[in-house]
Amino acid sequence: MNMSDQRIPQNTGDNSNNSNSNNNNNNNNNTHTISNLSAGLKSVSLTDQQQNEVNLNLLQQQLHRESSNQQQQSRITQFFQNQPAEGYTLFSHRSAPNGFKVAIILSELNLPFNTIFLDFNNGEQRAPEFVTINPNARVPALIDHFNENTSIWESGAIILYLVSKYLKENGECSLWSDNLIEQSQISSWLFFQTSGHAPMIGQALHFRYFHSCPVPSAVERYTDEVRRVYGVVEMALAERREALIMDLDVENAAAYSAGTTPLSQSRYFDYPVWLVGDRATVADLSFVPWNNVVDRIGINLKVEFPEVYKWTKYMMRRPAVIRALRGD
């Protein structure tokens, strides 16, 4: 409650009518204005010493709570007043997969960064300074202190900014490409993840755990859509695997083509495959944090989407991914 909105109770005993004239005559003697506690209370008057003490205690308690909130929120203000001269600052949340998605890319590129995990319970995402860099008041957001404190928001935009800048400064970027065709393919999968994969899992989680009342049809609808999305990824990875096996397992290629020997017999059946090219890119890594929570909506990747499961397992073993998911 704002102190300016808080009503201070007055003495309303049975003798209040009889005391009105006395109170008016002695107004200057027994009325005290509390002007040093809050600008919003300058016009509040207390007319009874006992009431004075009670109300002052209430005011002090409220002011203490407001002061505590201001101190908690002030770390955001303090940061923006004293930003680092170099490196990157990532604004995230402990339960936000999209924030960890950006952390994975920063870690993979070995870029110096610090993470500020916002406290949503205290409304830090609505701090004016933060809204200035992310008008959507959500995470993630990134500040590039190397580049005049440039701010970027939305996970996909942040990722493309990072790999494009890295390529420009270093001449190559293994998570991206200098080839326009590959760039378009990587971008397609990245946008598919940000627009179709993550939001559907997010909605399934919401209606399963956080909605105010059960809506089974919503849970079913979003969970089914997540399965459809994984079906798209599963098929793409399976095609990559088949192409890989046919290319590397030459002596058995004819048997695989004829169907007399299943692909699962190949020694390359568990070899890592990727969505674009022969290496992990941001197209692949952007899926990791959300794949890591999809079991919470009742989807078993190992059973239902074995290629997605193997693909995720390979990425989860990467040192940079491990560091990022730990919050290092």
Curated annotation (Swiss-Prot):
Keyword field: Nitrate assimilation
Pfam families in UniProt: GST_C, GST_N
Stretches assigned to the GST N-terminal domain: 86-170
SUPFAM superfamilies hit by this protein: GST C-terminal domain-like, Thioredoxin-like
UniProt entry tagged with the keyword 4Fe-4S: no
Region (Disordered): 1-35
Domain GST C-terminal: 179-328
Summary of subunit composition and partner proteins: Homodimer.
Name of the protein described by the UniProt record: Protein URE2
Species in which this protein is naturally found: Candida maltosa (Yeast)
Phylogenetic classification of the source organism: Eukaryota, Fungi, Dikarya, Ascomycota, Saccharomycotina
